[in-house]
Every structure is written in C-alpha cells, then in structure tokens.
Swiss-Prot record:
Protein name according to UniProt: Elongation factor Ts
PANTHER family membership: ELONGATION FACTOR TS (PTHR11741), ELONGATION FACTOR TS, MITOCHONDRIAL (PTHR11741:SF0)
Gene: tsf
Family from the record: Belongs to the EF-Ts family.
Gene Ontology cellular component terms for the protein in this record: cytoplasm
Domain of life: Bacteria
Organism: Gluconobacter oxydans (strain 621H) (Gluconobacter suboxydans)
Function (record text): Associates with the EF-Tu.GDP complex and induces the exchange of GDP to GTP. It remains bound to the aminoacyl-tRNA.EF-Tu.GTP complex up to the GTP hydrolysis stage on the ribosome.
Keywords: Cytoplasm, Elongation factor, Protein biosynthesis
Length: 302
C-alpha cells in the first residue's frame, strides 16, 4: 500500500475538486491508487448528485456559441450565484453551448453529445454536481440559423467571452455575410437585452395577450364617457403604442432614440427573421430558506 502523503491528497483534490477529508478517505479505501481513488470519489459523488437533484436551481449562467450563419444559446442553472463564478462551471456552460451549435436545441440530443473530456454532456453534468456539491440542470437551449446572412450573439456584462446572465441571438438574412452586418446583429442583441421585446413583428404577437390588452384599453377609454366611435379610435391608437413597446421591429432603436428597428434593418439591406433572449432564472420561483428550520434539522430537533 502506497503511503497516503499530503502531496497525494492535494493531487487528488486538484484532480477532482473534492474535499480534503474525502480525498484522504478515498486514497485510504483505494490503498493509495490514484485512479481507484478517483473512481471511489465518483461513485460517492453519484450518490450525492442523486440527493441534490430535488433542489431548486435558479442561478447559473447563459452561454452562447456562434459560427457565422448559425448560433446557439443555452441556460445552465445551479443553486447559488457562487457556482456561476466557478471556472469549471463556466467551462461546462461553454461546452454545452458548442454541443448545441453542433446538434441543435433538443435537450436530449445535447445531453447525449460529447464534451472534450470524452464524457457525454449528461455524464459531465453529473460529475460536476458531485465535484462542486450543488444541483445543476441544463434548462433550455435555442439554435437560430439562416441560409445567407448572419446570426449574431450578444451577452450583456459577460463574465468571459460568450458567458453571462443575459444572452441574445439575432438572425439577419442578407445576400452575403459582412462585418457591418455582424455589427448590426450585435447591436440588435444589445437592443433586445435592454428592451425585452415579446415578439418579432405584429403578426407574431400572442393573440391572447393582445386581446387582454385590448379589453383593458377599452374599459379605460370608456371611463372617458366619449362615444363608442371615438373610443374605438382611442383604443386603436393605444394598441399601436402597445406594439411599439412589445414588438421588436416596431420599437425605437436604442442607439439613436429616433429610428424604428425595422428601418434600421431595412437600411442595412437585411431582413431580421428571428431573435431569442435568455435571462438567467426568468420564470423560476426561488425557494425561500427557513434558516431556523435548517439549524433545527442539523441539530436533530424539530
């Protein structure tokens, strides 16, 4: 049996990210064999990962990957903001985005894809859960592509290239790709990050959302006591204002505060055919922690 030295424990810890005492125990169980110790930790980690799978994951990162006329965006969640600053987690998000770029935005296909370690994305995720000690989940993915033109990506306040908490893809069709078109795409990404449009054009506005808005506007207009014919005109004017707020092509361009997005794109000789905006954790209800209950549980009391 090899001697369990501090250097050996440190080497195992650096290789796996596991705790010092766990590494020492693993080496003892494996009689000092490094590979066997790693396997022991992985087995232990798999058990831990299963226990953590029920925890809420509302933190994490958004990642993008681009290849000229195609781009992918993913959201990978974790339990705490601390994990988002972990380099191994950031690297994993990058890898998942690149897998999505290759295989598309079906989550099962992404999880079956391979990462540089040789593992599948699903296995790499399980390994990361065991190593870092938090539940994690690949929440969603989106891939946009065009036959001719560009799909630009933008990450707001990126922690590193292509990684942050808000990401946007913008698909522009044009006769050819150009640096100017890519720049416009990134500017559209910046605009979308700031304005949060709900639809690309008027035709793609959610009919139910539109009807709810119209019903509210009608009731508001009727309070004025004006005739129905005038109320109808008032409502139509306010619906146009609603479109300017939620429809990307109808919005005022944030870079000059005057032009419509549609005119900016038209002037560039392009057509904006799609966009996607991911904001980390949107729609996820975070769990409220009961600190007193946690302390009581840890102490074995109720």
């Amino acid at each position: 049996m090899a001697e369990i030295t501090a250097a050996l424990v440190r080497e195992l810890r650096e290789a796996t990210g596991a705790g010092m005492m766990d590494c020492k125990k693993a080496l003892t169980e494996a009689a000092g064999d490094m590979e066997a110790a790693i396997d022991w930790l992985r087995t232990k980690g798999l058990s831990q990962a299963a226990k953590k799978s029920g925890r809420t994951t509302a933190e994490g990162l958004v990642g993008v990957a681009s290849a000229k006329n195609r781009a992918a965006m993913v959201e990978v969640n974790a339990e705490t903001d601390f994990v988002g600053r972990n380099e191994a987690f950031q690297a994993f998000v990058e890898q998942v985005a690149h897998v999505a770029l290759e295989v598309g935005d079906d989550l099962d296909a992404i999880k079956a894809g391979k990462v540089p370690s040789g593992r599948t994305v699903a296995d790499e995720l399980t390994h990361l859960i065991a190593t870092i000690g938090e539940n994690m989940a690949i929440r969603r993915a989106k891939v946009l592509s065009v036959e001719s033109g560009v799909v630009a990506s933008y990450v707001h306040s990126a922690l590193r290239p292509g990684i942050g908490k808000i990401g946007v893809l913008a698909a522009l069709e044009a006769p050819s790709e150009s640096d100017a078109l890519l720049t416009l795409g990134r500017q559209i990404g910046m605009h979308v990050a700031a304005t949060r449009p709900a639809a690309l054009d008027v035709a793609s506005v959610d009919p139910e959302a539109l009807e709810r808005e119209r019903a509210v506007l009608i009731e508001q207009a009727r309070e004025s006591g004006k005739p129905e014919a005038i109320i109808e005109k008032m409502v139509e004017g306010r619906i146009r204002k609603f479109y300017e707020e939620v429809v990307l092509l109808e919005q005022v361009w944030v870079l000059d505060g005057e032009s419509r997005v549609a005119k900016v794109v038209e002037k560039a000789g392009a057509k904006l055919v799609g966009f996607e905006r991911f904001q980390l954790g949107e729609g996820i209800e975070k769990e409220e922690s009961d600190f007193a209950a946690e302390v009581a549980a840890a102490a074995g009391t109720k």
